[in-house]
Structures are given as structure tokens and as C-alpha cells.
Amino acid sequence: MSIGLLCCVAFSLLWASPVNAGVTQTPKFQVLKTGQSMTLQCAQDMNHNSMYWYRQDPGMGLRLIYYSASEGTTDKGEVPNGYNVSRLNKREFSLRLESAAPSQTSVYFCASSE
């Protein structure tokens, strides 16, 4: 690879603009003791109507916890027990673990769609 090409690539990366995040979940990582509660926040910047919370346990596929077809409405998914949700506006959909249990150790995903 020539020096000219290498410098061009480095320069292009320095001037790259940020990309829209789409869906943002916070916090990214969390460890809880049994019985503790916490809220996972999800925000989307794509003006989508529908939002979803999923969990993925080791060796399993995604399982729907709750979903919302529009702001102010929520419906239970496949595994809603132990969770509550809130969708006060089009952009945000929060998931609350009321009392953490070892069975809730999982990877959590938020998604949105038209």
C-alpha cells in the first residue's frame, strides 16, 4: 500500500461525520443483586410507531417481553412476567425489572419499526 493512499484513508476517517444511532439502549451493561429493581431506557430517532423489548437467554432465540404499537399503548409479549413498560411518547420505551431474579439474567434488546 502506498503512503499516499494510507494518508488519504486516515484523512477520510478524521472527517467522517457521526451516523444516526437509530435505536439507543441505556445502560449498556448492568449487574443487579437479587431483589433489586432497575429501568432500561430505549430511544429511537427514526419516528417509528412500534417499539419492542426482547430478551435472549443463552442458547435461545429472541423472546418478546412487551411491545407498543403507538405511544400510550403497550401489550404483553411471550415473557412479560416480572417486567413493566412505559411508552409516554413516540421516541421512548422503557422496561422496568421490578425485582431482579436469577432467571432474568439475559441479554436485552430494544427495537423499533414502522
UniProtKB/Swiss-Prot annotation:
Domain of life of the native organism: Eukaryota
UniProt signal peptide: 1-21
One cellular-component annotation, GO: T cell receptor complex
Disulfide bonds: C42-C110
Pfam families found in the cross-reference section: V-set (PF07686)
InterPro entries referenced in this protein's UniProt entry, alphabetically: Ig-like_dom, Ig-like_dom_sf, Ig-like_fold, Ig_V-set, TCR_beta_variable
Function: V region of the variable domain of T cell receptor (TR) beta chain that participates in the antigen recognition. Alpha-beta T cell receptors are antigen specific receptors which are essential to the immune response and are present on the cell surface of T lymphocytes. Recognize peptide-major histocompatibility (MH) (pMH) complexes that are displayed by antigen presenting cells (APC), a prerequisite for efficient T cell adaptive immunity against pathogens.
Protein name (Swiss-Prot/TrEMBL): T cell receptor beta variable 6-1
Gene: TRBV6-1
